[in-house]
Amino acid sequence: MSASSLLEQRPKGQGNKVQNGSVHQKDGLNDDDFEPYLSPQARPNNAYTAMSDSYLPSYYSPSIGFSYSLGEAAWSTGGDTAMPYLTSYGQLSNGEPHFLPDAMFGQPGALGSTPFLGQHGFNFFPSGIDFSAWGNNSSQGQSTQSSGYSSNYAYAPSSLGGAMIDGQSAFASETLNKAPGMNTIDQGMAALKLGSTEVASNVPKVVGSAVGSGSITSNIVASNSLPPATIAPPKPASWADIASKPAKQQPKLKTKNGIAGSSLPPPPIKHNMDIGTWDNKGPVAKAPSQALVQNIGQQPTQGSPQPVGQQANNSPPVAQASVGQQTQPLPPPPPQPAQLSVQQQAAQPTRWVAPRNRGSGFGHNGVDGNGVGQTQAGSGSTPSEPHPVLEKLRSINNYNPKDFDWNLKHGRVFIIKSYSEDDIHRSIKYNIWCSTEHGNKRLDAAYRSMNGKGPVYLLFSVNGSGHFCGVAEMKSAVDYNTCAGVWSQDKWKGRFDVRWIFVKDVPNSQLRHIRLENNENKPVTNSRDTQEVPLEKAKQVLKIIASYKHTTSIFDDFSHYEKRQEEEESVKKERQGRGK
C-alpha cells in the first residue's frame, strides 16, 4: 500500500472512532450537557483572571472596605505628576484611612464587567478607556490644569466614609475638605517670590489650598460655598521701586578717642620691624610741621608725638602716627593744604629710615663738630648723654678728619652693603667686619694684591637706608677660620680688621650722579655688595663724603644699638642654657 493511500484513509479512520453510540452525536445528547465543558473556551490561554473582570472575594480582603467613590491618579512620574502612595491589599479594611489612589479601582464598567457585589470594577487606567498612557490625564467633564499641583493627588477619606477628594475640588458641595498640609510645597514656593510676605498675608488660610498659585487661588475664589473674599492684589515690587528707596543710614564708627568721623581717610598701614634690618622698607611718616601741629592742636584730642629718645629705650622704634589718623567732630571741615601734603608724604612708599631720622625730616638734627648728633626730644632740645663706649671710641679714633687725603694715587675702593645698622654699630665698636663667602674672597684678594702699596677703602651703606653711613679702611687679610660671634646673624664666617675713618650719613642724592662703567653704567648708589669702584670714580665719591657737612650719623643711635646688643646676648645665653 502506498503512502498516498495511507494519508487518504487516515482521516476517515479517525473520524469513525465512535464506539457504543450513534454516528450523529446529537441524536442521543442534549445541548446543556456540554455547557460546562464549553465555557472555558471563552478564555483560551489565560492562566490568570483578566484585569477587567471582577475579583474573587476569597482572594482579596472583604468587599466592605471599598465603599468609597474613588477618583483618579496617575501611575507614572512623567511630566509634573507625583507618584501616589500605594498600600498593599492585605492592609485594606473598613473605616481605616488609606492613601490608595483612585486609579486602582475606577468607575464601574470602565474596561470590565459589572462590579462584583456592588463594588467597583478592577481598572488600572484612570478616566476610562480614553486615558493617554504616561501623559497628563484629564477626566471626562474636567478641565485640564497646567499646574503641577492639581488633581494628581488622592487624599485620605475620613473614618466615617465618603468619597475621596481630588486635589482639584474646592468647597463646592463636599462635606470633607482636602487633606491637611496639602499645599506646603506651594506655600514654600510662594515664599521665594519677591514680596511673598504680602501674598501670604492677603490670601486666606484655607486647609488644602495653595498660596501663590494662580490657578488654585482662582478656584478657591470662584467656589460656590465660600463667600467671595476681597483679596488685595500683591503690591508690585520692581527693581525701580527698590532703587528709589533711600539707603539706610549706616551707624558712624567711632575711633579710639571716641569721636565719630574723620576729616581724612586713614593712611596706609605701616609695619615697622626691628631697627636697622636691611629689608625693612616700610613707609615712615615724617613729623608734621609746627604750624600744622598748632592747627591740629585745636582738636579735642590729639596724640602727642613720642620723643625719639624714648623710642630708643626698650622696644624697636615705631613711626609716629600720621596726621591722617587724627579725628575731628562732625561736620568735618575741609582738609587744609598742609594736611594734604603731609598725608601724601605719608602715603608714598619711602626707604628705610634710621631711628635718628624717624622723629623729623632727614638732615634736621643738630650735630656737633665731632659728628656726635643731638636728638630732638619732645621734652626739650637738650642733647642726650653720650654712651661711655662711644666716648671711649671717640677718644681713641679721630672720626671724620678734616685733613683726609681723598686724592689717591694707588688704592682700591669697594662698596659694602650691610643688612642692618646693628652690624655697622658692632663693626665700629670692635673694628672688625665680615662679608659673604664670595665677598670675603674678593676683599682678601684685593688686600693681598695691594701688599701695602695703597689702602683698600670700604664704602658702607645699609640696604634700603638711602644713604652711605661711613668709610672704613681694611687693615688685615681675611681670617676664614674665625667667627666673630657678635653679628645680628650667626651665618657669617671669617673676619678681618678695619679702621673707621668717616661716620656720617651722606644721602644718595649727593652721589647718584656718579656712574660706574664696570657696573652697566649704573649709579654708584645702585651697587651690590663688594662692588669695586674704579679709582677715578672712587676719588669723586671720597671727596664728596669727606666734604659733606652731615647732620646725622649712627652715633645718634649708639645707645639704642648698645641696648639691642645686650638684649640679643641675653637671649643667646638663655638658648644656650636650654640646650644644655
Swiss-Prot record:
Q: Which UniProt keywords apply?
A: Acetylation, Cell cycle, Cell division, Cytoplasm, Differentiation, Immunity, Innate immunity, Mitosis, Nucleus, Oogenesis, Phosphoprotein, RNA-binding, Spermatogenesis, Ubl conjugation
Map out region (Disordered) in residue numbers: 1-45, 247-388
Indicate whether Acetylation appears among the record's keywords: yes
- State the Gene Ontology BP annotations: embryonic morphogenesis; endothelial to hematopoietic transition; gamete generation; hematopoietic stem cell proliferation; innate immune response; mRNA catabolic process; mRNA destabilization; negative regulation of Notch signaling pathway
Annotated spans, Localization to mRNA processing bodies (P-bodies): 2-385
Predominant location category: cytoplasm
Q: What is this protein called?
A: YTH domain-containing family protein 2
